[in-house]
């Protein structure tokens, strides 16, 4: 585990882009492309336009390389049908894709965090949902963190995974 380095900031939105900061989508692509063994993702919402910014293609690419992907989705059954269908297809095609449903009995409780952790060494923490609006159109902010901080965020996702249900329909559910 390397020591913490300073956070890197990425943004979306017309009033924030173009001021020497990376775009969120560029930061996500760059970080995920460097994965060596595992990617953990916590998602509140995955938008219907996700394929427009290549999120599913990015997942397919890392899964084809044999990278383990854990995706914990808030209330999977409430996600758009087209998104659920694609995720179930990925789960059935790739044994290294673990799809989990965070669906607590208390309806006031949600997984609202937007997190991506790569190899327990890099963490992306931000406000953007996995949607066209979140990754491109809205004014959103994301930080890339490393070292102990990223490791601890990965541990939190490990704990959340244990307390989430495997989605029925894939080999892991």
Please report, for each region that a protein language model flagged, where it lies by residue:
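Glycine- and other small-residue-rich loops at beta-strand/loop junctions that grip anionic moieties
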Residues: 44
């Amino acid at each position: 585990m390397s020591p913490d380095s300073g956070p890197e900031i990425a943004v979306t939105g017309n009033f924030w882009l173009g001021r020497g900061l990376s775009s969120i989508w560029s930061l996500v692509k760059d970080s995920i492309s460097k994965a060596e063994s595992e990617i953990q993702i916590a998602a509140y919402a995955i938008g219907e336009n996700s394929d427009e910014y290549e999120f599913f293609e990015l997942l397919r690419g890392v899964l084809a390389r044999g990278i383990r992907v854990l995706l914990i989705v808030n209330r999977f059954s409430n996600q758009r049908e087209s998104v659920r269908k694609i995720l179930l297809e990925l789960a059935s095609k790739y044994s290294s894709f673990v799809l989990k449903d965070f669906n607590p009995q208390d309806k006031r409780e949600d997984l609202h965090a937007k997190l991506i952790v790569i190899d327990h060494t890099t963490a992306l923490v931000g406000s953007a949902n996995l949607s066209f609006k979140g990754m491109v159109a809205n004014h959103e902010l994301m930080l890339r963190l490393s070292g102990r901080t990223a490791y601890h965020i990965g541990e939190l996702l490990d704990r959340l995974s244990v307390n989430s249900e495997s989605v029925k329909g894939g080999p892991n559910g």
